[in-house]
Swiss-Prot record:
GO terms for cellular component: extracellular region. Disulfide bonds: none annotated. The active site is at D144, H204, S528. The gene is SBT4.4. This is Subtilisin-like protease SBT4.4. Keywords: Autocatalytic cleavage, Glycoprotein, Hydrolase, Protease, Secreted, Serine protease, Signal, Zymogen. Belongs to the peptidase S8 family. It comes from the Eukaryota.
């Protein structure tokens, strides 16, 4: 990533917090920057001490005997490496050392439920299967902004001691205590040990942790909204917290430390609601590298797909060994009505808890309240330093964007009505606000132009039913992957809009300086919220199948997902929006067949992407090599639960996908292949063989799918579904073929 200023977006309660940061941090050491020095796997010899080795390397490169201020992190548990402050010339010398696998800058990353689990069918009661004793031995590692340990969602009432496999520690720092629910905590953000604390000061980490594994807490709500029982997917599971994010963002070198510790601590699933601001190659992606090491020892990494949709090729979680999650809306939404002076009611979206008591306030358009120093276009957007306080004080301000809402409140506005850029989600603000659709916003402007004294009031929010759910959220990042064209990303979709979950009272629900509210539960949106839903489902599946590998769990969730849709046309409305579909926790525990992958399969896949042996080792951390034969591996033949290929849109093509399934259903079963094509499909799809006869558990059988067509064009991907059915199980795999101009 190029040096310079990037923006980090923290999706806390629908608030976009913009923070300026430098991609490779410069500090007080002149032109030194923080780099991650990756040395691969840990040597097996007993006398090897990583820390001493890392310090020795630094002393050799820098020529300095005292290098404590240079060494930032030492990775010494699950893989080998360190982070250090280096000059450019020192970086080059390090990169040239034979034993150094790679040196890359520590980048900034960004942070990206009362009804959501019920919506997915995972309801509490006798109809939902649970194995509490095994669930209690399950540990979810949450890499995020910390946690508020005093929340009822993390009470350890009824919990026994941590599982025997737990090897971690509670290093939460000052004002932080672990218990038998939150069994581990570490902080990587503090500049000194004295300031270390895993406490969550943004609310984001608390929210995500409770979605994955929070206790069932009755009467949870946000000022009465969303009232119900908030709980995680596996309420009896344990939580280990790894704080890598603060108000300056999330450092890549801290992320690597979190992976190093989490893997060694013994977690079963890792949930990361954090994404890079750009899309680096795997060998420079701390999540991809850390997750590869996790996968190699049986730990599944679940990652948010990103919040940069609906633009195509914005999904940042692209490695096939990382479970990438898109966000969907559920069957519940929040609205805030706007009542005009003439009695007309407009339906807006908002999580508004403020009551105007039915009082009508004067309306003023931002562009009509502009300072002379500001252009009308900027004032129309209510941009900072554009509004005249005398003209907005005591009024409801109309804004064409959210940019100046805090400014309007600061100048004395009593509320605001905003043109909604994302009509499928509601926002929390620090004073009365309603977000209107384009049509309703035009109606409001028309009303203002038709009367001398336009007035309105904004009502408190109400809950409404969303009959269109599940539907992919507009903001959810889309594929196809810009790194790997023949792997469908994102993988799966889960609830990520207006999710009520635990929150940290150490932060306001909007992080606005004017917001004095402190809450125990709040409503947030983003793929950050979708990610822990899938982490919870993965942990739930693992309680029934403790010996399953990460790829088996991922396959079970993907092949049992609900088919779904996305609004719009072209790429943004296809599987590149929602992957395999919407997660179904109940069916995922009994998939029938799974597509299994090993570390060796992923290495062959990387070789097929033309990775050299040197680049391969950056990710694998071992002595793997790419031979000529292995390098002929087609990436689309990775044994993935979906099938995707990029082709020429104007020429005939004939491509094949090779797959192998493992029987995890009934000992003796016969699966028949069925191809479901959409109306008007130009694809010819053949499956060989069309029948798979399984005679034993864990038996593997292979098949080939051949897809051909004269041409498909470049505007609309063409897709179908392959379903293997034995009458009980329906193992569904999307097939998508596309071309891009």
């Amino acid at each position: 990533m190029a040096k310079g200023t990037t923006f980090i977006f923290l999706f806390s309660s629908l608030l976009v917090l913009s923070l300026s940061s430098v991609s490779a941090d410069k500090d007080d050491h002149g032109d030194q920057q923080v780099y991650i020095v990756y040395l691969g796997s840990l040597p097996s010899r007993e006398e090897y001490t990583p820390m001493s080795d890392h310090m020795s390397i630094l002393q050799e490169i820098t020529g300095e005997s005292l290098i404590e201020n240079r060494l930032v992190r030492s990775y010494k548990k699950s893989f080998n490496g360190f982070a250090a402050r280096l000059t450019e010339s020192e970086r080059k010398r390090l990169a040239g050392m034979e034993r150094v696998v790679s040196v890359f800058p520590s980048r900034k990353l960004k942070l990206q439920t009362t009804s959501s689990w019920n919506f997915m069918g995972l309801k509490e009661g006798i109809k939902t299967k649970r194995t509490r004793s095994i669930e209690s031995d399950t540990i979810i590692g949450v890499i995020d902004s910390g946690i508020y340990p005093e929340s009822d969602s993390f009470s350890d009432q009824g919990f026994g001691p941590p599982p025997k496999k737990w090897k971690g520690t509670c290093a939460g720092g000052k004002n932080f205590t672990c218990n038998n629910k939150v069994i581990g905590a570490r902080d990587y953000t503090a500049k000194s040990k004295a300031n270390q604390t895993a406490r969550d000061y943004s609310g984001h980490g608390t929210h995500t942790a409770s979605i994955a594994a929070g206790n069932a807490v009755a009467n949870s709500n946000f000022y009465g909204l969303g009232n119900g029982t908030a709980r995680g997917g596996v309420p009896a599971a344990r939580i280990a917290v790894y704080k890598v994010c603060d108000n300056e963002g999330c450092d890549g070198e801290a992320m690597m430390s979190a992976f190093d510790d989490a893997i060694a601590d013994g977690v079963d699933v890792i949930s990361i609601s954090i994404v890079l601001d750009n899309i680096p190659p795997f060998e420079e992606d701390p999540i991809a590298i850390g997750a590869f090491h996790a996968m190699a020892v049986g730990v599944l990494t679940v990652n948010a797909a990103g919040n940069n949709g609906p633009k195509i090729s914005t999904v940042t979680s692209t490695a096939p060994w990382v479970f990438s999650v898109a966000a969907s809306v559920t069957n519940r939404a929040f609205m805030a009505k706007v009542v005009l002076g003439d009695g007309k009611i407009l339906i807006g979206r908002s999580v508004n808890t403020y009551d105007m008591n039915g009082t009508n306030y004067p309306l003023v358009y931002g562009k009509s309240a502009a300072l002379s120093t500001c252009s009308v276009d900027k004032a129309r957007l209510c941009e900072p330093k554009c509004l005249d306080g005398k003209l907005v004080k005591g009024k409801i301000v109309l804004c064409d964007s959210t940019k100046g809402l805090i400014e309007a409140q600061k100048l004395g506005a009593v509320g605001s009505i905003v043109k909604n850029p994302e009509p499928d989600r509601a926002f929390i603000r620090s004073f009365p606000v309603s977000f209107l659709s384009n049509d309703d916003y035009k109606s409001l402007v028309s009303y203002m132009n038709s009367t001398k004294n336009p007035k309105a009031t904004v009502l408190k929010s109400e809950e409404i039913s969303n009959q269109r759910a599940p539907l992919v959220a507009s903001f959810s990042s889309r594929g196809p992957s810009s790194i790997v064209s023949d792997i469908l990303k994102p993988d799966i979709t889960a609830p990520g809009v207006e999710i009520l979950a635990a929150y940290s009272p150490d932060s306001s629900p909007t992080e606005s300086e004017f917001d004095t509210r402190r809450v125990k539960y709040s409503v947030l949106s983003g793929t950050s919220m979708a990610c822990p839903h899938v982490a919870g489902v993965a942990a739930y599946v693992k309680t029934f199948h403790p010996q399953w590998s990460p790829s088996m769990i991922q396959s079970a969730i993907m092949t049992t997902a609900w088919p779904m849709n996305a609004s719009g046309s072209g790429f943004v409305s296809t599987e590149f929006a929602y992957g395999s579909g919407h997660v179904d926790p109940i069916d995922a525990i009994n998939p029938g067949l799974v597509y299994e992958l090993t570390k060796a399969d992923h290495i062959n896949f990387l070789c097929g992407l033309n990775y050299t042996s040197d680049h391969l080792r950056i990710i694998s951390g071992d002595n793997s090599t790419c031979t000529k034969e292995i390098s002929k591996t087609l990436p689309r033949n990775l044994n993935y639960p979906t099938m995707s290929a990029k082709v020429s849109g104007t020429k005939p093509f004939n491509i094949t996908f090779q797959r192998t399934v493992t029987n995890v259903g009934m000992q003796k079963s016969t699966y028949n292949a069925k191809v479901v094509k959409f109306p008007g499909s130009k694809l010819s799809i053949k499956v060989s063989p069309r029948v798979l006869s399984m005679k034993s558990m864990n038996e593997k059988q292979s098949f080939m799918v051949t897809v051909s067509s004269d041409s498909i064009g470049t505007k609309q991907p063409v897709s179908a579904n392959l379903i293997w059915s034995d009458g009980t199980h329906n193992v569904r795999s999307p097939i998508i073929v596309y071309a891009m101009s």
